[in-house]
Regions:
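Conserved NAD(P)H cofactor-binding loop of Rossmann-fold oxidoreductase domains
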Residues: 40-45
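Substrate-binding pocket helix/loop in short-chain dehydrogenase/reductase
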Residues: 47-48, 52-60
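Active-site loop immediately N-terminal to the catalytic Tyr-X3-Lys motif
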Residues: 49, 96-100
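Active-site helix of classical SDR
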Residues: 71, 105
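Residue(s) in the substrate-gating loop at a strand-loop-helix junction
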Residues: 89
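Active-site-adjacent segment of SDR/Rossmann-fold oxidoreductases
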Residues: 94, 115-125
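C-terminal helical subdomain
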Residues: 129, 144-189
Length: 204
C-alpha cells in the first residue's frame, strides 16, 4: 500500500471499516471527502448447514456492517458533487452455493446503496454500485472451479470513469463481467483450489 501511495503521490490511512470508533478516528483529520470507494470485504464462508454464527458474522461485518460504518463517518464531510461508489458482486443477483453469508452481504450492500441514494440525492451526492463478476484476486483462489474473470484494473477503470460522470446524470449501477465467447473472450482462470482437489483425487 505504501508503494502504491508513493507512486501516485497519495497518503494512505489504515483503518478497520467494521469498527465505528477506530474508523471515525482514522478519517477524523480529513476536512472534506470528495469520493468514497467501498472496496473492503471478504469472501469466505461455507454451506449454511456447516456455517457457525461466528463465521456468518465475520462475513456480514466485513461486507455489510462496513457500509454503515464507512458511510456514517464520511457523510458529514461530503458536499454537493461528491459521491459514493460501492464495489458489490454478481453474487448479489446470482447467489453462490456454499457462500450464503457472502451472497447475502452483497445483496444487502446493494439495498443499502440504493436506499442511501434516495436519502442523499437532495444534497447533490451521488451513489453508484459497481457489480463485477469473478475478479482474479487472491479471494478467487478458494473457488473450486475454473472460470473467466476480469482483472482488478478493469474494476479500477470503471471506478475512475464513474468519478468523471456529470453530477446531473443518474447512474445507479455498472455491471462488469468477462467476455466468454469470440475474439475477446478471457482465458479461464484455474484457482488453486481446483489444483488441490485434482491432486487429492490423484492420491486417492
Amino acid at each position: 500500500m505504501r508503494a502504491a501511495a508513493d507512486e501516485i503521490g497519495a497518503r494512505y490511512i489504515v483503518a478497520d471499516a467494521s469498527d465505528p470508533d477506530s474508523f471515525a478516528a482514522a478519517i477524523g483529520p480529513l476536512e472534506t471527502i470528495d469520493l468514497v470507494v467501498h472496496a473492503a470485504g471478504a469472501l469466505g464462508g461455507t454451506y449454511a448447514r456447516k456455517q457457525t454464527f461466528e463465521q456468518w458474522r465475520a462475513i456480514i461485518s466485513a461486507n455489510l456492517d462496513s457500509c454503515f460504518v464507512l458511510t456514517s463517518a464520511a457523510l458529514p464531510k461530503m458536499r454537493a458533487g461528491s459521491r459514493f461508489i460501492f464495489i458489490s458482486s454478481s453474487a448479489s443477483y446470482e447467489p453462490m452455493m456454499a457462500r450464503t453469508a457472502y451472497s447475502a452481504s452483497k445483496a444487502g450492500m446493494n439495498a443499502f446503496a440504493r436506499a442511501l441514494a434516495l436519502e442523499v440525492d437532495r444534497d447533490g451526492i451521488a451513489v453508484h454500485i459497481v457489480t463485477p463478476g469473478p475478479v482474479e484476486t487472491e479471494m478467487l483462489q478458494d473457488v473450486p472451479f475454473e472460470m473467466q474473470a476480469i482483472q482488478v484494473s478493469d474494476v479500477a477503470d470503471a471506478v475512475a470513469w464513474l468519478d468523471t460522470v456529470d453530477p446531473s446524470v443518474d447512474l445507479p449501477e455498472i455491471r462488469l463481467s468477462a467476455v466468454r465467447r469470440g475474439p475477446y473472450a478471457r482465458v479461464p482462470v484455474v484457482p488453486d483450489e481446483v489444483h488441490r482437489r485434482a491432486a487429492s483425487a490423484e492420491k486417492s
